[in-house]
Amino acid sequence: MAAQAQAPARDGGAQLAGPAAEADPLGRFTCPVCLEVYEKPVQVPCGHVFCSACLQECLKPKKPVCGVCRSALAPGVRAVELERQIESTETSCHGCRKNFFLSKIRAHVATCSKYQNYIMEGVKATTKDASRQPRSVPNRYTFPCPYCPEKNFDQEGLVEHCKLSHSTDTKSVVCPICASMPWGDPNYRSANFIEHLQRRHQFSYDTFVDYDVDEEDMINQVLQRSIIDQ
């Protein structure tokens, strides 16, 4: 029988537990670079896991560092157990609602017209709401802490501050990083903000996003980098 998205912890990777695991059962199968289900997962010496192709990109700088813990980055080894779990764990497509093994879901959503419509409707709804009230260009370089009066953190600084000072805070808060994005909803409150930070904001959006594109181009970008968000 195929496992559901709540199998044992991945090879050497960060493990979700309690409410966080229930809220995001696919989190431990998600690459912190591309934010999609691991493809040919590789575990690096510090214990974190990346898609093989994503790791190759991360290794290109002269002094590469792990994007999760910032330790020195080096080639890793194939995460065999995690790969086995991906082969045997099922999830459903948000578009057609059919079940697929995690190892097959990336290929499926790339060709599923219902999934693409699901993504486009979400992006259009967000951009439509944002266009109703013109706003000045948001500051995407420094952010306030949503828990306390501290402010002027860069993205990495905010992640570290919240991990050190607010790791046990269970209050639902708005993510200031997401709220500054073109598609961001300034009213959406994250149920588990610390876990959200660790999974979604270990890498800067500036690396992947062109903030000046129009709506159609933005939709195409989202489709290409669509996140499987259960």
UniProtKB/Swiss-Prot annotation:
One of its GO terms (molecular function) is zinc ion binding. The keyword Nucleus applies. Pathway: Protein modification; protein ubiquitination. A zinc finger (C2HC RNF-type) spans 93-112. A zinc finger (RING-type) spans 31-70. The modification N6-acetyllysine is found at residues 104, 114. Zn(2+) binds at residues 93, 96, 108, 112. CDD domains: RING-HC_RNF114. It catalyses: S-ubiquitinyl-[E2 ubiquitin-conjugating enzyme]-L-cysteine + [acceptor protein]-L-lysine = [E2 ubiquitin-conjugating enzyme]-L-cysteine + N(6)-ubiquitinyl-[acceptor protein]-L-lysine. Its EC number is 2.3.2.27. It comes from the Eukaryota. GO terms for cellular component: cytosol; nucleus; plasma membrane. SMART domains: RING (SM00184). It holds the Pfam family zf-Di19. Autoubiquitinated. Polyubiquitinated in the presence of E2 enzymes UBE2D1, UBE2D2 and UBE2D3, but only monoubiquitinated in the presence of UBE2E1. It is found in: Cytoplasm; Nucleus. It is an enzyme of class 2 (transferase). Keywords: Acetylation, Cytoplasm, Developmental protein, Differentiation, Metal-binding, Nucleus, Spermatogenesis, Transferase, Ubl conjugation, Ubl conjugation pathway, Zinc, Zinc-finger. Disulfide bonds: none annotated. Interacts with XAF1, the interaction increases XAF1 stability and proapoptotic effects, and may regulate IFN signaling. E3 ubiquitin-protein ligase that promotes the ubiquitination of various substrates. In turn, participates in the regulation of many biological processes including cell cycle, apoptosis, osteoclastogenesis as well as innate or adaptive immunity. Acts as negative regulator of NF-kappa-B-dependent transcription by promoting the ubiquitination and stabilization of the NF-kappa-B inhibitor TNFAIP3. May promote the ubiquitination of TRAF6 as well. Also acts as a negative regulator of T-cell activation. This is E3 ubiquitin-protein ligase RNF114. It comes from Bos taurus. The gene is RNF114.
